[in-house]
Amino acid sequence: MLNHPSQGSDDAQDEKQGDFPVIEEEKTQAVTLKDSYVSDDVANSTERYNLSPSPEDEDFEGPTEEEMQTLRHVGGKIPMRCWLIAIVELSERFSYYGLSAPFQNYMEYGPNDSPKGVLSLNSQGATGLSYFFQFWCYVTPVFGGYVADTFWGKYNTICCGTAIYIAGIFILFITSIPSVGNRDSAIGGFIAAIILIGIATGMIKANLSVLIADQLPKRKPSIKVLKSGERVIVDSNITLQNVFMFFYFMINVGSLSLMATTELEYHKGFWAAYLLPFCFFWIAVVTLIFGKKQYIQRPIGDKVIAKSFKVCWILTKNKFDFNAAKPSVHPEKNYPWNDKFVDEIKRALAACKVFIFYPIYWTQYGTMISSFITQASMMELHGIPNDFLQAFDSIALIIFIPIFEKFVYPFIRRYTPLKPITKIFFGFMFGSFAMTWAAVLQSFVYKAGPWYNEPLGHNTPNHVHVCWQIPAYVLISFSEIFASITGLEYAYSKAPASMKSFIMSIFLLTNAFGSAIGCALSPVTVDPKFTWLFTGLAVACFISGCLFWLCFRKYNDTEEEMNAMDYEEEDEFDLNPISAPKANDIEILEPMESLRSTTKY
């Protein structure tokens, strides 16, 4: 979304005539697009776009209000450059999950324990440090989002993050080699590595999901007649939903690396488990470098974060009266923004309020990479590494994301709109069901011999098969489809154009708060308290979901109104990078209700 200033008729007329500075490159006319809060330095830089009309615009037919309510909504097409960005995400998540999957064993156990480890921090210490790593990885996106939106831009921030990431993985790999050092050096290397990886993750995570969504022009809904003769509405909001489903699908393809790294940990050692992600991460580096000219890189805001905080301060002093911050209402104040910016801040604040209950959701989600692994170590593994079963969450997502996107969501949309608030509520409920299953399973573990309530104090497990954990992972995957994917979509779609990375980082910050709650709960991650841990999380997630629905269901009624703000400027332009020919755009399906094409998805 590119916002144009409403600063009088003269300026508006200039914009209509296309009075922009022209840049020659490869015999293609390009222009620099500026909004009311983009600096001149940035606007005259390399942010160039092809403003040739889109082929679809020539036959544009807008729907009536009745058609908006009655016709089926479908998505548009996804450009090839989105696939390149998705490959970067896949590579980064391959490395992240491949590294973090063995962390619990690496921290909790010693070299002579079963399962083997390195740092000997016991269950409480390992769980606490695991939650710290999650906390750190989701605090740093605030820094990454601020830097990207204010100084460097998304692409440059991502590139800087990849360099730091490589350094962190290399330190972890070197210090995990048994012949290189002892336990003390391993602890030092581990701490240094997770700090660097956390910083890098923040710089990448706050911007990559925004960058992939930036590749989609925001267009008004239009009528399309399918080959079957059915009239449907091509809705860019559905396209955005499809992109984030696809993006999350690629995350989980990458997360399957834990299947390889846990096996390497079990059979070769931790050094081998960390070498694989180090090597694989270079795919992200290569894709970023060679795909640079393909990406749309939007202008960097001119101190837009600082201006947004000034608006919020004015709102606080005036009891959140948004008119108090509008230049049209108070021209004597000479505010360095326009009314449109204030309206976008209002929408962004509404989105941030929706995120208030997410820390509880992320707390239950975090048990999957900490307490679930410890629970598995109490059970009969039958040759399976205790940290291997995390893969079933990713496998379930890879299976069910296309099913939801191709069948479930289109089926529901035939009869009623499925709005974001409703989907997030369902996500909380499935999270509660997952913790309920884990609590019941834990009670059976404690009732089984030979060790009953104290299986962690022995090297042999209780007689319960570890595969009983799989339903909990599947339920968590359902909760992610509804709550996590929709949260990403909501954070992007409700953020002002030049604050999208920062608002996305606020959403990711809720994960950090969830990890902080998990750290506070680490003292109860001991025998025989795990049953109460899972029960408490189930109740908390259920209550939070109900409160979420009661507080925010009204936003479902204003969803279309909030989304309409995005159409006001971008519908005039086709935002394709100069170097990306139209032939690179691929039609996934007609209608685009599935993201699967020539690849697995």
UniProtKB/Swiss-Prot annotation:
According to the record, the segments passing through the membrane are 151-172, 183-202, 211-229, 268-287, 295-316, 379-399, 413-429, 449-466, 495-513, 527-547, 555-577
Which GO biological process categories is it annotated with? dipeptide import across plasma membrane; dipeptide transport; peptide transport; protein transport; tripeptide transport
**Localization per Swiss-Prot or TrEMBL:** Membrane
In this UniProt entry, the residues modified to Phosphotyrosine are 37
Q: Where is the composition biased (Acidic residues)?
A: 55-66
Regions of biased composition (Polar residues) lie at: 1-10, 42-53
Spans annotated as Disordered = 1-66
Q: Where are the Cytoplasmic topological domains?
A: 173-182, 230-267, 317-378, 430-448, 514-526, 578-601
Renumbered to this chain, the Basic and acidic residues biased-composition regions fall at 14-28
- Keywords, A to Z? Membrane, Peptide transport, Phosphoprotein, Protein transport, Transmembrane, Transmembrane helix, Transport
**Cleavable signal peptide:** none
What is the protein's known function? Uptake of small peptides.
PANTHER family found in the cross-reference section = OLIGOPEPTIDE TRANSPORTER-RELATED
Q: What is this protein called?
A: Peptide transporter PTR2
Native species: Saccharomyces cerevisiae (strain ATCC 204508 / S288c)
